[in-house]
Amino acid sequence: MDAIKKKMQAMKIEKENALDKSEQLENKLKEIEDVKVKIEEDLTSLQKKYTNQENEYDKVNEQFNESTVKLEASEKRVTECEDEIKGFTRRIQLLEDELERTQQKAEEAVLKLEEASKAADESERGRKVLESRSIADDDRIDKLEKDVKDSKYLAEEADRKYDEAARKLAITEVDLERAETRLEAAESKITELSEELQVVGNNCKALQNAVDQASQREDSYEETIRDLTQRLKDAENRAAEAERVVNKLQKEVDRLEDELLQEKEKYKQISDELDQTFAELAGM
């Protein structure tokens, strides 16, 4: 009987020890699971931060590309404006040359008209002198008459040339007015283009400043990205280490779970033995 009591007492103590060890194992398992969850949360947070930095870098790079395209378009527009200004300058020079030639032709026509008028006046004076002297020489009279006719013809031709010159001069004046109008329009266009060129230049400077700032931001972001990349590598190393620790802990958990299962089976076996012992005692 004493042996049975001692055995029951030993089994009771062993049962209590098994319960304590089981509780300790469960607490240790819970702590390990909490550490595992914390490590997984840190890893998720690091991956999210890295993704956000990648998106920010893509956005800055896209803004830099847009600024480059705008700068190239502005430079192209400036070149086009400079070409237009050169074209207007050449046209103005051609108009001025044409006006100078027209004025020179008009002066030559007026000079020829004056010479023809002088010749006609001289012939008329000669005819009057011949008439006053009553020269009876028909040949000379015929010649003089012919000279007079020629002089009249020259005078008429001079008048015609004068009229033609006057008409051309009028046309030239109209062309000159048109040229002056076109010149004024060209000067206005040049002024407008100069203002536009100045605006474009200011825009180019602003774009260049924006590009410089974007470049500085890009350098800053590149430095940040390098830092984040290093931090990500460190995080990945820590994550790998954490995964290694988790795997190790998982193995420990599996071992503890197996040990817990064995303890539970052992506890069940002890409980069954106690039940059997109590049954034997009750049967006695």
UniProtKB/Swiss-Prot annotation:
Q: Carries keyword Transmembrane helix?
A: no
Which family, according to UniProt? Belongs to the tropomyosin family.
Record InterPro entries: Tropomyosin
Give the organism's phylogenetic lineage.
Answer: Eukaryota, Metazoa, Spiralia, Lophotrochozoa, Mollusca
Which domain of life, per UniProt?
Eukaryota
User: One Pfam family name from the record?
Assistant: Tropomyosin
For domains, the record's comment is: The molecule is in a coiled coil structure that is formed by 2 polypeptide chains. The sequence exhibits a prominent seven-residues periodicity.
Q: What is this protein called?
A: Tropomyosin
Q: Name one GO molecular function term.
A: protein homodimerization activity
Q: What does this protein do?
A: Tropomyosin, in association with the troponin complex, plays a central role in the calcium dependent regulation of muscle contraction.
Q: Which UniProt keywords apply?
A: Allergen, Coiled coil, Muscle protein, Repeat
The UniProt record lists the keyword Repeat = yes
Q: Which GO terms describe its biological process?
A: regulation of muscle contraction
Q: How does it assemble?
A: Homodimer.
Coiled-coil positions are 1-280
